[in-house]
Amino acid sequence: SATPEFPHGQYDKELRDKSVNFKGLRGIRNYDITNPEKPELLEEYSTGVKGNGTHHNFYDGGKYAYLDCGWDDQLRMENHQRPYSNAIMIVDMSDPSHVKEVSRWWVPGQRFGEEAEYKKYIFAGDRTSWTGNHGALTVPKRVEDGGNLGYGGFGAFGMFVLDLSDIAHPKPIGHVQYEFNALGTIPFHTVYPVLADAAHPRLQNMMIGLHEALEADCREVYHTPYMIDVKDPRNPKIVGLFPKPQAPPDAPYNDFCLARGRFGSHNSQCWLAPGISKPEIFAAAWFNAGVRVFDISNPTAPKEVAYFVPPHEGEINDYESWWRGSTENCFVEFDRNLIWIGTHEGSYCLSCPALGKPVLEPRKVDKWSVAHCNVGWDESTPRAFYFGGAGARPASA
């Protein structure tokens, strides 16, 4: 990343050399956490001796893991933050002690040498845009259970829908970009699937595309998350935009652009969470604007219903202490109606009226928000409870 010492980020040779010559693991580590107090390392899996390794992967305990992965030095990156970009690597996790690569996919034009394809994009050569994957591939239904679609955010390239029917050869079948895309930021950072049942018909087949702000103090065009209708996976459509958070009335600034640090969305609540999801409620970390909670029951007009802005520490003359903003992550416990956030100054546990009365006592997780992750979790609950029909009891984990 750009710093006062290296203001041009990867375009400063000294910083770039440090990054590309890193000697540590580029890949993933798998652990057995049967005993959470003593995790046991099963394997260190290298995705390549060059490139970025992995960053923000998707794995729900099934056969396959979807890695946000840079496996070599041929995946181009315009933005100053990294020397190379990432794409998708799918690996077989059947034996977590012996991971096997299944396939790779990247946007045509993303690799050096694919110049004709790359030059079709307006941002080619701008040294600003994020030209790669950032949040791996979200696969709402496991391939081994009959699922065949994955949704991935590829920065300035947009969101791609991949057909995984032949998982050894993923194929793009759908694509969407925001029509007012601008230089900078990560327009499509991650893609979050809304978990909606028949009681919430307007939210079925909906995805939320999150962007990530990159530059402090709004030194780039502001982006906002998008509600995306994927009923037709070959023709995904942006149908709604999230409102821009406003500064609290008692804040010493009237706009978050003046609050120091990054202003914009980053990571959202986790897809897999304790309890039964409340599909109309969505929470996301917003850097210097804290955590924001939205009512998305009308997907064409998401509405903010709550926020929490934690203290933002840092010295005004110490760029490294404030440039990222503060709030990076959030996690919702639907069974206890709690929101956890991770910030650079510490972690917070929050309640929110939109979720309901908080439960502060520890409790065992009876069920998870994603149906297929409950199989094997509780042997006393029939499979039909999660999947309908007259299915048998889940096999033990």
Annotate each predicted stretch with a short phrase:
Residues S1-A397:
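Feature marking well-ordered beta-strand scaffolds used for ligand recognition
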